[in-house]
Amino acid sequence: MQFNNTWLNELNGFHTTLRPMPLKNARLLYYSAELAQDLGLDERLFDAQNVGLWSGERLAEGMQPLAQVYSGHQFGVWAGQLGDGRGLLLGEQQLPDGRKFDWHLKGAGLTPYSRMGDGRAVLRSTLREFLAGEAMYHLGIPTSRALTVVTSDEPVYRETTEAGAMLLRVAESHVRFGHFEHYYYQGQTEKVTQLADYVIRHHWPELVQEKDRYLLWFSDVVQRTARMIAGWQSVGFAHGVMNTDNMSILGLTFDYGPYGFLDDYRPDLICNHSDHQGRYSFENQPMIGLWNLNRLAHALSGLMSPQQLKQALAGYEPELMRCWGEKMRAKLGLLTPAKDDNNILTGLLSLMTKEGSDYTRTFRQLSQSEQLQLRSPMRDEFIDRDAFDSWYNVWRQRVLQEERSDEERQQTMKLANPALVLRNYLAQQAIERAEQDDISVLARLHQALSRPFDDAPEYADLAQRPPDWGKKLEVSCSS
């Protein structure tokens, strides 16, 4: 493994250097073998005797851990200085193919930015983040991922006493909108410029020599954010806490906390029980994405003219709608756009809202429909079967215009409509067993989530509607 730390070497004063605080009797609970292989890691690194590498007791050569400082808007209100309160950027892994990945250890102990926290993470939240990153990655949504989950005998006090844990998160970058806000609101505009130049140099090197590099860069940040959120909306993912300090400059989904996937199609779903006003509801995410980009634009106002910032921001909605429309047409089995496609989509979504239909299962079942069937077996899932039959007939006539075989259409539709997603109750079942040192449920769920688009009878039980108790789970920011 080859590591360095360009953040440390190139950005003086943007962080505090310190070492992780190891946990009591730490042990490696689980890891992603697939990600380890992609990173070129020897499987022997995950033997019990090497737990120190994943628990902060031992640093690999070239690692220089540090805590980053940033600020942000939380629930629409300026929160001031935040920063890595329990996580450390260990270093950047350099792969032979030129790719670079941050290694970030979460739950690594107190930092100067811990505020009132204890610097620790609990097993419950680390497993939720691990599973979320894996699920989103295999759904094709840009995301951070987690390599390892470490548990311990160290008690951590939240609503109850829980096991202290650590998560090793891997991402191309951990730069957030809030990094730029921090220095802007401190009046350190030269550091805003320095940070922008750093990000462009390392992640947009093709723009370094461009005269309008800041405009071109910010425009791409806007577009990436739009595409990320379009992906969220297409798979029914609600992030839960879209504060500006949780927004990636690369358009990656990260900082998984009180997230959730739609069960019943409820556009107003609020998955964070601390979000009393519904600011971060599922249907509000596209709007919040733009609001957050406006906050970033404000922080970058010293780098571009107001006209340039408006020009970049103006690209958000068209790109969001283009990408979302493309994904939703694919979910309906439509290759080429037609003028009535939006009516077909809204007709189905309205019917699903009225009926309380399961979002993931409804689209997956539609993928299996045969276009010569005058009546779909899906109708039995609906109370108002006449309304469904009416919609189905319109959809069927539209699909026939595509002039594709059932087999071809079904295959492409299945690639747009997962058979299973990470429902909260599935994660909870895996967590409860893992807390008893039984990782069998976790491992099985992880394997299933790596094949979300497959017809996999062995995982059919994971693709069902949640039981009643599973619909009533509440998730908070507590982690």
Swiss-Prot record:
Record-listed E.C. numbers: 2.7.7.-, 2.7.7.108
Tagged with keyword Transferase: yes
Catalysed conversion reaction: L-seryl-[protein] + ATP = 3-O-(5'-adenylyl)-L-seryl-[protein] + diphosphate; L-threonyl-[protein] + ATP = 3-O-(5'-adenylyl)-L-threonyl-[protein] + diphosphate; L-tyrosyl-[protein] + ATP = O-(5'-adenylyl)-L-tyrosyl-[protein] + diphosphate; L-histidyl-[protein] + UTP = N(tele)-(5'-uridylyl)-L-histidyl-[protein] + diphosphate
Cofactor annotation: Mg(2+); Mn(2+)
Function noted in UniProt: Nucleotidyltransferase involved in the post-translational modification of proteins. It can catalyze the addition of adenosine monophosphate (AMP) or uridine monophosphate (UMP) to a protein, resulting in modifications known as AMPylation and UMPylation.
Homology family: Belongs to the SELO family.
Entry protein name: Protein nucleotidyltransferase YdiU
Gene name per UniProt: ydiU
